[in-house]
């Protein structure tokens, strides 16, 4: 059972949810914890009052769900128009945006990869070429769930969040995923380096059957350690078999640690 979840206070998430309701006609029913609640074929759709970064309660409120997809807005100071996918977690620091310090959520590499590819398909189908399709590096909460969770987002301002075409792009992406529109398999990996929008990692995932779990952007490399790398590989529904590193922006000390780590763990290592 897939749980599609959103905040009723978020115009992007609620707009995507409304599109899915219009398209799939799920049965509206009640849930004591949800403001809006629907049941469909193989999925539930639930809207909550809380902001999505504080959705650590999902397992208590939706115990029947095996995997969560969060429908959400994305904010960017640069104003980048985007459709993005990412996993959750805090590599270090104070966890100012939900979750716990030093904790990563459970990644679902194949789900995130399928959503990324479908986003590109529907971005092109709706001629939204001004929108970037991208992974984001792992960030923010929730982090404490024992089931996998993936965010899919519209960026990056109120006009984009309210736009009905954007709701259709992301809504059709989610519907395509629910219907099994892409059945391809992929090689699970983790990513190191690159910016918050790790373009080289995204380009690789769109060109090859490699699907990313956690991605650590270059701004988070100060937190990289064996312990953190263990979390990146273990907090996933499937064990990664390769570590892919954007070489530019990583220092020799990072590369040395990674080379020792992959040798010890019998993982492949690739620089891009």
From Swiss-Prot:
The Enzyme Commission number assigned here is 3.1.1.96
Top-level EC class, please? Answer: hydrolase
Q: Which organism is it from?
A: Desulfurococcus amylolyticus (strain DSM 18924 / JCM 16383 / VKM B-2413 / 1221n) (Desulfurococcus kamchatkensis)
What's any GO biological process attached to this entry? D-amino acid catabolic process
Q: What is this protein called?
A: D-aminoacyl-tRNA deacylase
Q: Family, per the entry? A: Belongs to the DtdA deacylase family.
- Report the protein's function: D-aminoacyl-tRNA deacylase with broad substrate specificity. By recycling D-aminoacyl-tRNA to D-amino acids and free tRNA molecules, this enzyme counteracts the toxicity associated with the formation of D-aminoacyl-tRNA entities in vivo.
**Keyword set for this entry?**
Hydrolase, Metal-binding, Zinc
Q: Which cofactor does it need?
A: Zn(2+)
Q: Which GO terms describe its molecular function?
A: D-aminoacyl-tRNA deacylase activity; zinc ion binding
The organism's taxonomy opens as:
Archaea, Thermoproteota, Thermoprotei, Desulfurococcales, Desulfurococcaceae
Which superkingdom, per the lineage? Archaea
Q: Name the SUPFAM superfamilies on file.
A: AF0625-like
Q: Which reaction does it catalyse?
A: a D-aminoacyl-tRNA + H2O = a tRNA + a D-alpha-amino acid + H(+); glycyl-tRNA(Ala) + H2O = tRNA(Ala) + glycine + H(+)
Partners and quaternary state? Monomer.
Q: How does the cofactor bind to this protein, according to its record?
A: Binds 2 Zn(2+) ions per subunit.
């Amino acid at each position: 059972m897939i749980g599609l979840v959103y905040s009723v206070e978020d115009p992007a998430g609620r707009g995507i949810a409304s599109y899915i309701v219009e398209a799939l006609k799920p049965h509206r029913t009640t849930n004591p914890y949800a403001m809006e609640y629907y049941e469909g074929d193989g999925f539930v759709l639930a809207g909550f009052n809380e902001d999505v970064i504080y959705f650590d309660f999902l397992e208590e409120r939706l115990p029947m769900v095996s995997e969560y997809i969060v429908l959400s807005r994305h904010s960017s100071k640069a104003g980048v128009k985007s459709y993005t996918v990412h996993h959750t977690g805090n590599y270090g620091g104070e966890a100012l945006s939900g979750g716990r310090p030093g904790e990563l959520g459970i990644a679902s590499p194949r789900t995130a990869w399928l959503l990324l590819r479908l986003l590109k398909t529907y971005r092109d189908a709706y001629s939204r070429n001004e929108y970037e399709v991208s992974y984001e590096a792992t960030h923010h909460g929730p982090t404490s769930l024992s089931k996998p969770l993936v965010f899919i987002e519209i960026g990056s301002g109120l006009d984009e969040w309210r736009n009905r075409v954007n709701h259709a792009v992301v809504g059709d992406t989610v519907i395509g995923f629910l219907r099994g529109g892409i059945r391809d398999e992929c090689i699970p990996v983790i990513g190191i380096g690159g910016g918050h929008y790790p373009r080289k990692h995204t380009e690789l995932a769109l060109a090859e059957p490699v699907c990313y779990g956690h991605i650590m952007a270059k701004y988070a490399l100060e937190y990289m350690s064996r312990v953190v790398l263990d979390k990146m590989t273990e907090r996933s529904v499937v064990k990664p078999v390769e570590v892919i590193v954007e070489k530019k922006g990583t220092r020799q000390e990072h590369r040395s640690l990674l080379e020792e780590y992959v040798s010890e763990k019998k993982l492949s290592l690739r620089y891009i």
